[in-house]
């Protein structure tokens, strides 16, 4: 959502200039890493921003990610439960991170994974995959040194789908898999079944 250290524009600036947000202010409801592609919920007013924030807090919004990872996991499906660390000033803070995973395909030393985070920690999926020996392909921050990457060094993590319910109505939004992601799938002989 925010601009990176080398970029002056962010998604909010871009949205403000669109017809959909004319006369309103976009309220980001959650974060997505700047290199990650896919679905992002942005509310058009404070009321809905607060509603979606509360749905996230009580874990009523479910996100699905697709990821191309380096390596293979020990199981075809399961749950990662890890303690992640970050710093607030000089204090080291420990937080619990939970992610459900399913291996969709593997070939050589690459895996196509479906990831469903139960918690929403900063860089959670990237950190957990590194902990479990399968870093995200193209991740320059959370990587195993001297491991292969892709030619364009793009992060192969895609926020594929978001599901939630409001007042007994179910909603599901998905983002098409980017061309760059499809190319790497083809290059690594991985298939989404």
Descriptions of predicted regions:
Residues 1-193:
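RNA pseudouridine synthases
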């Amino acid at each position: 959502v925010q601009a990176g250290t080398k970029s002056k524009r962010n998604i909010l600036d871009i949205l403000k200039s669109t017809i959909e947000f004319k006369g309103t202010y976009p309220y980001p409801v959650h974060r997505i890493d700047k290199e990650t592609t896919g679905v992002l919920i942005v509310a058009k007013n404070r009321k809905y921003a607060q509603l979606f924030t509360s749905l996230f807090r009580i874990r009523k919004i479910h996100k699905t990610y697709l990821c191309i990872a380096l390596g293979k996991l020990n199981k075809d499906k399961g749950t990662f439960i890890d303690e992640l660390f970050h710093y607030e000033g000089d204090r080291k803070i420990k937080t619990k991170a939970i992610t459900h995973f399913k291996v969709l395909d593997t070939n050589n030393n690459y895996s196509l994974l479906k990831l469903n985070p139960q918690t929403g920690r900063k860089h959670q999926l990237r950190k957990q995959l590194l902990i479990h020996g399968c870093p995200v392909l193209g991740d320059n921050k959370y990587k195993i040194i001297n491991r292969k990457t892709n030619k364009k060094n793009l992060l192969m993590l895609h926020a594929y789908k978001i599901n939630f319910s409001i007042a007994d109505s179910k909603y599901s939004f998905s983002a098409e898999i980017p061309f760059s992601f499809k190319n790497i799938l083809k290059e690594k002989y991985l298939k989404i079944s």
